[in-house]
């Protein structure tokens, strides 16, 4: 089956969407143990840690997408997945962005295939008429924490260098909806919902 889609994609005029690879639960369970170690480091309470349900590798960010664009985008993502064979990936190491603004886990394995899938997901958005950010070389990263202000991420990155997770086979591409916090409660995180998934390498 080439597409795994729920019956309803939207409930209002637009959705905040991105394409992603979603690691399976046994893989994120390994990472959760590593994050527990990271959160015991000095200063960890000053970071905003992302919840395990939100862990993903973003391939392309589309922003707000109008309802009438979603079918075309979905068809193009299905084609992108179909043209990409399944590949092996593992969570491995990590780094930071923005001089202490974000901490992330990296990837090992067939990163070239992941980069190719990201390029195809980005192209799908452009061909569907979405306004995309300026193209940059893809950096595989899974965001673990963000700093409310620039902090010294050195100890966290150093500890992450020791992390090497088990590999898994990436078999599908997901279209994910980001539901931003609305309650105003401090620390509330976005909720992520896969609204479409397409099997890699499928012929149908």
Feature annotation, model-predicted:
Residues 3-204:
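Histidine-dependent nucleotide/RNA phosphoesterase domain, centered on the 2H-phosphoesterase fold
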